Amino acid sequence: GGAGLRAAIEAAPHMKLAVITKLYPTRSHTGAAQGGMSAALANVEEDNWNWHSFDTVKGSDYLADQPAVDILCKEAIDSVVELEHWGLPFSRLENGKIAQRRFGGHTVKEGEAPAFRACYAADRTGHMILQTLYQKCVSMGVTFFDEFQVLDIKIDDGVCKGVVAYEIATGDIHVFEARAVTFATGGFGKIYKVSSNAHSLTGDGPGILYQKGIPLEDMEFYQFHPCLLYTSPSPRDDCP
């Protein structure tokens, strides 16, 4: 998905790497994100990353790692511009700048009024992010192993040395040896009865790491996106 592709772009200039993906990269659930990505560009009205950070921490009920939130909100501005330079076709204002719209929870001046902060590409922002990142990876010569499902990690003397993967098309098992491994496997929404997550989000990555005793953090905070309403099992709820 988006996180794995972006990690590959960051690492590619410094090392030989490969992306192992259960799906074709542009079929990731990142493509389900429609509304936009928030960054305090101030293209429509006054804005700054401090207000963005305030809204994010408040939206987390003050449970978020606040220094990490500051980094996220501050660097979001350059990240959006970077995606634009890589070719992401953002929607535009009449003056040619990246369009921004209101989105839930975002305000100016720490709650004074709603903020125009979400940068978007019509109603397919996530899809265009995936396409842009994948094209950037291809242009950088990143190697892809599409439709390979990771089954386990290879650990020698407490050090991760690679992964074991199943080639879906042939049923063959492969061992990939590496000096460093990054997991960016997305969520696990399909363990829940009601979820809008893609059927591929089965928690493979977190499950593998948990079985190896690798600590996982903040696992109780899980978001379904797009959101859903949980209805009662009454037959009348199925009526139009």
What are these regions (language model features)?
Residues A180-S232:
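Glycine-rich loop(s) and the adjacent beta-strand/alpha-helix scaffold that form part
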Residues A39-I71:
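Glycine-rich active-site loop/strand segments that organize a redox cofactor
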Residues G1-A18:
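N-terminal Rossmann-like FAD-binding beta1-loop-alpha1 element of flavoenzymes
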Residues G1-A3, Y24, R124, F188-G189:
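Residue-level detector of alpha-helix initiation sites
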Residues Y230-P240:
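Single conserved hydrophobic/aromatic residue that forms the stacking wall/gate
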Residues T30, L63-V69, V80-Q100, P215-D218:
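A short alpha-helix-loop-beta-strand transition element characteristic
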Residues E84-D172, E177, A184, L228-L229:
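Conserved redox-cofactor binding core of oxidoreductases
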Residues P13-A32:
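Glycine-rich FAD pyrophosphate-binding loop
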